[in-house]
Amino acid sequence: MTARKKPKVYITRKLPDAVETRMRELFDATLNIDDTPRSPEELKEAVKHADVLVPTVTDRIDSELIEAAGPQLKLIASFSNGVDNIDVAAAHARGITVTNTPNVL
């Protein structure tokens, strides 16, 4: 029997320790340990390989970034109360689900 691969999750900013610990347990997670904002170019490179993108409200997820994503990107799960920083229409056009975390802040 072959082990099932963990989804690749790219997390753009530092999250609470408990969240990052759980992410590492469940996923092949790339964390932003130093909490330095990633440039648009760095984000474009990251979404080429990610199954899930976890941005925060400070990250602009526009149509250009979404178009740079690989076909395996299926979810943008924003660690924020809203999704105003995400081009939801562009994501939906690519079959990417967009969610947020209400009451997280």
Where in this protein do the model-derived segments appear?
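N-terminal glycine-/charge-rich "phosphate-binding" loop or analogous flexible N-terminal tail
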Residues: M1-V52
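Phosphate/diphosphate ligand-binding glycine-rich loop within oxidoreductases
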Residues: V52-L105
